[in-house]
Swiss-Prot record:
Keyword Ribosomal protein: yes
BP GO annotations: translation
A GO term, aspect molecular function: structural constituent of ribosome
Alphabetical UniProt keywords: Chloroplast, Plastid, Ribonucleoprotein, Ribosomal protein
Family: Belongs to the bacterial ribosomal protein bL27 family.
Protein name: Large ribosomal subunit protein bL27c
Cellular component aspect of the GO annotation: chloroplast; cytosolic large ribosomal subunit
Gene: rpl27
Length: 86
């Protein structure tokens, strides 16, 4: 029996922890000020009305209201929060 591991097995076996990115509040959902709406890397979705952007590109609600996803042009999505449901 070998007393040393094979060269491949000691170099493998690492993986990073998941970062739990993605949409946290969906369209039509009620939110309060400060609720996280989307966790993302880069601005896949841009902040719209009443939505702030953190330094890690996290989008969060600035007011109490309802979430609405919109398209600002053909490609770019935005997320807004309105006080009354539209």
């Amino acid at each position: 029996m070998a007393h040393k591991k094979g060269s491949g097995s000691t170099r493998n076996g690492r993986d990073s922890n998941s970062k739990r990115l993605g949409v946290k509040k969906y369209g039509g959902e009620q939110v309060t000020a400060g609720n996280i709406l989307i966790r993302q890397r880069g601005t896949k979705v841009k902040p719209g009305q009443n939505v702030g952007k953190g330094k890690d590109d996290t989008l969060f609600s600035l007011i109490d209201g309802f979430v609405l996803f919109e398209k600002s042009n053909q490609k770019q999505k935005t997320i807004s929060v309105y006080s009354a449901k539209k």
